[in-house]
Structures are given as C-alpha cells and as structure tokens.
C-alpha cells in the first residue's frame, strides 16, 4: 500500500504539472496561433475596407435616438490617413484643458470633451523611477489611440447635440484638479444648452454632471451615451488564459462579461438591453478605463468591433431617453474610472458609489474565494513588515498553522505506516501468490493500526488551490508590481532575473529566455529534492524515476514564474520538511533523508568477474 500512496502522490503532482503546462505553455501557444490568424484576417478586412470605404462613418459606432446602440455617433475625425503623428503633435491639434492630480496628469480634448491624454504619475514602465510614466490614454489620431467620451444622441427636434466633433466652451477655471472642477458649455441652434461639470478625486475617478436646459419652444427627447474606444490591440496584450485583457463590464442580472479582443472580432457586436446596475470598459493587466452610469437607471450596454480604417474596439452604453419640456432642465451623472486597478481603491469605489461588482474589474480567477482573502491577508501583514516578500513568508507560516491538523494527521499516518513496514512485508511474502488475500490482510492491518494509506496525498492536494491563488495574487494585483524582496529580487511579480547559465551575471552574455534558471528556482529545486528524499525510494522503477526527475522538472517550470511564487514554494517545502521530521521523530520513525543522501554518493560495489 506504500506503493499506492506514492502512486497517488505521483498522480497529484503529474496533474499539477499538466495543468501548469496547459496554462503556461499550450495556452499561450494556441493563443499565439489565433493571434496570427486574427492579424491576417484584419489585413484582409482592411484591404476590403480601403476599397469600399465611405466618406462618413457616422452610423453604428456611437449610440442616436431612439435608444439603440447603433445610434451612437461615429468616432469623429481621427486624421489617421496621413503621415504618423507624434503624441505632442496630436495633442496640439485641438484646444484642451489641463488635468493635474496627485495620481494623474494629462488633458481633456475640448473637441468632444474627450478624455484622451492621461498619464499615471505613480507608475513607471520599469522598476526605475526615472523610466517613463505609464501612458494610459492617447488621442485617436495615434496608432494606439485610446479614449473615453460622453455625449448625447438626438433627432431633428433636438438639433445638433454634443458629440465627437462638438467644440465645448470653457467657463471659468481651465485646469482640472481635485479642488477645482471645470465647467464646459455648448448651446445649439434649437436653444438647448448643455452644461457639463467635470470633477476628479485624488485617485482615478472622474465625475461628469450634465445638465440639459431647454430654452426652446417644444419638448425634446434625447439620450446620453458613453464609450471607451481603443484603436488596435495593445502591444502588451496577454496571450495566456490566466488573465483577462480586453473588453469588460457588468450587465445587471447577466453579471460579469469578459470579452477578449479575438472574441469580439468574431462576434462584432454583443449587446445587453434594459440593464440596471453595472458598468462597461476596457481593461489591461494593471490599468483600466471604465464608464459607470447611474446604478438605479436602465441603460443598454454593448461591446463591438469596427474595421473602417483600422481595428477599433469599443465598450459603450446608452441611457434611456430623457425628456425635457420648454423652460425645464434634466440632469444626468456619469462616472469615469481611468487609472490603476489598486485593490483597496476599487473596493472603496464600489462601496462609496454602490457600483455593482466593481471589484471584478480585477481578474481574481477561479479561486476568487481564496485569492481575494489571501491578498487582503498579505496586504495586512505588509503594513507591519513593509515588504511584500516577507509578508508572503509570514502568510505561508499562517497557512501551515491553519492546515496543521490535516498535515499532522497525514504525517502521523505515514509514520505509523513506516513502522508497519515489517508486517506489510510479511503479508506480501505470505500471500505472494494470492493478491486478493494479500489486499484483505493489508486492509485488516490498516484498520487495526488505524492507518490511512492515502493520508500522504492531502498535504500535496491542499497546496494546489493555494498555489494557484497565490500565483493569481502575484500576477494580477498591481500592489505586487515592482515590489522588491531582498538582494537581486526587485520585482516579486517578475521571474528571478539571474541565470546559472551565465554564472548569475558573471559571464558577459545574455541567456535565452528558456535558460533563465535563477537562484531562487535552484534553491526551490534543491529543497524539493530534499523533501522527496524524506521517504524511502519507491521500489517501482517508474515511480522512482518520476520522484527523481520531479525536482528538476519543477525547477525549469517555475523558473519563468514570478519570483514571489518560487520563494513561497521553497519556503513552504522547507516548513514541510521540518514538520515531517518532527512528527516522524516523535513517532519513533527513522528519517530516511540522510541515508538516501548517503546512498546517492556511496560507491556501488563492482560486480564480481565471472
């Protein structure tokens, strides 16, 4: 039965390897193939569009009356057909008002009142504070144009309502800060006046208060629209199934919607009508831009893809019709989140503004119920330690304490099984020719001695969801981005940057990515090797080979994982070795580690010459 226990442990580890292989190798490979097919299809569509392009693209991509997503106005003049523009040249094409907050800098384009120029002050492209700040939004005339826009759709009775080409007029203050909102106005030929007040907090939430004043002689009906538009896929778009990057939103009772770029290219248009409570946007790994309508009013949400002159991805929403009588006014408030997906900030916005499931803007994954609490625990401990790496080590100890009863019971059962090895050997020899009686005798022995032959599997199986949950925390939470540990580990969310194949930087050449086997993966592999040697070598040659090669396989596999995860795995295995050693010693069971290590280096006797 000892062999069966080893067999089940082998199966559990094999399943883990296959799962990791699927997620981190086959998944990206398949996604890359799909990406190549997508690019080829885009090129074909672009050629076709160039031959059949119409002078105007005013139908289909911005919500008009009646309240139908197809009524949204076109994206306006992007001036993308000419020579490529620099960012400064694109920004200089239209009048703007400056944005300056503790977290953001940029400007609002007065043409369309677009938020299309935004940098994140607190985040840089690399671990160096001297590297460029993260660029979130960019003018539509650039190749990677990315903007947020709020406007209105109307009809003949309303006249021209604010849209992508409307030039707003600034009243008073012309710099947006947390303490100084800005006011924009526009009056059309039907005596409708639109007054927009834009405010921003210290973090990443913009509040847009629109007032429609009817100074005309007839009742009018119009609707408010909003959209987040991105031209071309981002260069950093993830090719794995571990993380969602693309269009995203919560659609009332339909819940969370995650639409990858490739999916919306296939479907072109995905709509949800009569939604109450939710939001729409586009998300990256660490950043996002979203539109948040009034949570107690109906809206229509839509995800779409256009190929008029270049690929364009869009998340938009359209309010229910607003009726404004002569001499009366109507108000509507929308919010725009544009910034870093800081966990506590997102959670506070959800609570403060009652935004439905806004916390799902962060991709917590399948093990949401483990991943999110684990992050909060790590974050809480970080407040005391000041180092996320140390916090992970402390959390590992706490997890060991939490699962101690289960692990303790398992190790005790394993220790008792080792004490029973002589009796088990006796049974095998006694019933060598009768497997049925051998199994019956074994089961009676287990029952009499209160041994669970599968107990050793539990410590391994319990680690699997914890492993994936911690990986998710390290991979998706911005708090872990560029978080240092000690020494050469300056980013826990990135792989160990060293490699044994250039002697950890002593040799002056760059090592290929697949040979980046750093210090911590090697430490993890050695500790895993020692853990495997805590038990006798399985008599079955196949199992023995698997147990021998398992640490080497894991060393290569985990080398490309976040350093924080490798450190966790090494520390967790170290604690397991200590725990197992103490329990075995208390049970009077011999620890096989040292004998197994001696056996590796002991010179085998030469066979006698025949």
From Swiss-Prot:
The gene is yidC. GO terms for biological process: protein insertion into membrane; protein transport. It is found in: Cell inner membrane. Coiled coil: none annotated. Residues 44-55 have a biased composition (Low complexity). Required for the insertion and/or proper folding and/or complex formation of integral membrane proteins into the membrane. Involved in integration of membrane proteins that insert both dependently and independently of the Sec translocase complex, as well as at least some lipoproteins. Aids folding of multispanning membrane proteins. The keyword Metal-binding does not apply. This is Membrane protein insertase YidC. The chain crosses the membrane at residues 7-27, 358-378, 387-407, 458-478, 510-530, 546-566. The keyword Cell inner membrane applies.
């Amino acid at each position: 039965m000892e062999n069966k226990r080893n067999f089940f442990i082998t199966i559990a580890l094999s399943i883990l390897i296959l799962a990791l292989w699927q997620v981190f190798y086959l998944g990206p490979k398949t996604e890359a193939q799909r990406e190549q097919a997508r690019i080829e299809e885009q090129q074909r569509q672009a050629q076709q569009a160039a031959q059949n392009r119409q002078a105007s693209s005013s139908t289909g991509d911005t919500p008009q009356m009646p309240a139908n997503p197809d009524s949204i106005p076109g994206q306006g003049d992007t001036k993308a057909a000419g020579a490529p523009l620099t960012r400064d040249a694109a920004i200089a094409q239209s009048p703007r008002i400056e944005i300056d907050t503790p977290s953001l800098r940029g400007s609002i384009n007065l043409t369309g009142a677009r938020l299309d120029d935004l940098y994140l002050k607190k985040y840089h492209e690399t671990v160096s504070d001297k590297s460029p700040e993260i660029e979130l939004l960019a003018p539509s005339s650039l190749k990677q144009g990315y903007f947020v826009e709020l406007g209105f759709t109307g009809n003949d009775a309303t006249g021209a309502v604010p849209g992508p080409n409307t030039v707003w007029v600034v009243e008073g203050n012309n710099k947006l800060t947390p303490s100084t909102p800005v006011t924009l106005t526009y009056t059309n030929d039907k005596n409708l006046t639109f007054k927009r007040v834009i405010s921003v907090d210290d973090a990443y939430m913009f509040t847009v208060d629109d007032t429609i004043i009817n100074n005309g002689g007839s009742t009018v009906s119009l609707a408010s629209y909003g959209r987040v538009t991105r031209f071309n896929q981002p260069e950093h778009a993830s090719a794995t199934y571990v993380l969602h990057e693309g269009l995203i939103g919560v659609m009332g009772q339909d819940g969370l919607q995650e639409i990858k770029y490739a999916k919306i290219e296939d479907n072109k248009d995905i709509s949800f009508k009569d939604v109450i409570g939710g939001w729409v946007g586009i998300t990256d790994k660490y950043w996002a831009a979203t539109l948040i309508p009034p949570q107690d009013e109906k809206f229509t949400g839509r995800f779409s893809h256009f190929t008029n002159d270049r690929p364009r991805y869009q998340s938009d929403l359209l309010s229910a019709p607003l009726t404004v009588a002569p001499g009366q006014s109507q108000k509507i408030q929308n919010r725009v989140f544009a910034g870093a997906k800081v966990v506590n900030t997102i959670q506070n916005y959800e609570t403060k503004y009652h935004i439905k499931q806004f916390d799902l803007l962060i991709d917590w994954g399948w093990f949401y119920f483990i991943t999110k609490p684990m992050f909060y625990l790590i974050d809480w401990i970080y407040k005391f330690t000041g180092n996320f790496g140390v916090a992970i080590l402390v959390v590992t100890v706490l997890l060991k304490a939490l699962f101690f009863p289960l692990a303790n019971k398992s190790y005790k059962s394993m220790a008792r099984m080792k004490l029973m090895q002589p009796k088990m050997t006796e049974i095998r020899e006694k019933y060598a020719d009768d497997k049925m009686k051998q199994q019956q005798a074994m089961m009676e022995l287990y029952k009499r001695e209160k041994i669970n032959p599968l107990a050793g599997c539990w410590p391994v199986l319990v680690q699997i969801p914890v492993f994936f949950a911690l990986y998710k925390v390290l991979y998706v939470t911005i708090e872990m981005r560029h978080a240092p540990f000690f020494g050469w580990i300056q980013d826990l969310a990135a792989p160990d940057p060293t490699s044994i194949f250039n002697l950890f930087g002593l040799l002056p050449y760059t090592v290929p990515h697949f040979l980046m086997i750093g210090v911590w993966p090697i430490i993890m592999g050695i500790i895993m090797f020692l853990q495997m040697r805590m038990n006798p070598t399985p008599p079955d040659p196949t199992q023995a080979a698997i147990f021998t090669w398992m640490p080497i396989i894991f060393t290569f596999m985990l080398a490309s994982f976040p350093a924080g995860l490798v450190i966790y795995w090494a520390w967790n295995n170290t604690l397991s070795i200590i725990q197992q050693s103490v329990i075995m010693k208390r049970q009077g069971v011999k620890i096989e580690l040292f004998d197994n290590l001696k056996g590796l280096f002991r010179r085998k006797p030469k066979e006698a010459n025949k």
